[in-house]
C-alpha cells in the first residue's frame, strides 16, 4: 500500500435492530408479569406520561458497544429504565413508600428474567428475530429523581446487557 492512500474498511455488523427487539422483549416480560405497570419504549417527561399509583416504566435506549471479542464476539447494550409513580399525599414519606414498592416489583421481574437467562430458558434469553442471546443483564446504577417533579416520584436504573450473536460462525473453536 502506498503512503497516504485511503483505505476503506467495511464496518463490522454491530447488532442491527437487536436493541429494539431487546427493548420490546423487556417490555413484554414486564407486561406478562402481571405487575400492572404501564410500560413504554422511549423517554418522555414524567409529567406527560400519565403516571398514576400503578406506576409507569420507560425503557430507554443507551449506547451499543462491542465487547471483548477474543473468544466469542458479543455486544453490550446499555439501557436506562425509569420507574415512576404518583402520590398526592402531602406527607412526602408516603411517596417514598410508593416508589420503594414499585422498585421492589420491578426488580423482582428483572431478577427473574436474569435468573431465567442464566438457566438458558430460551423464551427468556433468545431474541427470536435478530438471533441474539442475552448472556447477562446487570444493573450498574440506580438513581432517585431527587424529588424534582413531586407529586411524581421516580427511579432511573442503568443496565448493561451482554448479548452474543447466535448466527455467528466461530469456526469450531474458541480461537
Can you say where each PLM-predicted feature lies in the sequence?
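A short, hydrophobic beta-strand-centered structural micro-motif
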Residues: 51-64
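Charged, amphipathic alpha-helical segments and their flanking helix caps
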Residues: 1-41, 45-48, 63-175
Amino acid at each position: 500500500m502506498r503512503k497516504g492512500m485511503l483505505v476503506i474498511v467495511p464496518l463490522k455488523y454491530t447488532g442491527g435492530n437487536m436493541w429494539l427487539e431487546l427493548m420490546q422483549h423487556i417490555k413484554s416480560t414486564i407486561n406478562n408479569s402481571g405487575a400492572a405497570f404501564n410500560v413504554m419504549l422511549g423517554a418522555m417527561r414524567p409529567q406527560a406520561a400519565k403516571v398514576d399509583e400503578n406506576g409507569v416504566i420507560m425503557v430507554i435506549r443507551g449506547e451499543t458497544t462491542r465487547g471483548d471479542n477474543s473468544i466469542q464476539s458479543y455486544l453490550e447494550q446499555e439501557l436506562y429504565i425509569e420507574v415512576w409513580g404518583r402520590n398526592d399525599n402531602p406527607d412526602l414519606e408516603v411517596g417514598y413508600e410508593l416508589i420503594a414498592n414499585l422498585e421492589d416489583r420491578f426488580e423482582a421481574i428483572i431478577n427473574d428474567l436474569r435468573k431465567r437467562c442464566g438457566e438458558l430458558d430460551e423464551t427468556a434469553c433468545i431474541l427470536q428475530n435478530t438471533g441474539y442471546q442475552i448472556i447477562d443483564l446487570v444493573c450498574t446504577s440506580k438513581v432517585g429523581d431527587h424529588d424534582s417533579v413531586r407529586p411524581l416520584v421516580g427511579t432511573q436504573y442503568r443496565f448493561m446487557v451482554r448479548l452474543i450473536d447466535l448466527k455467528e460462525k466461530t469456526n469450531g473453536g474458541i480461537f
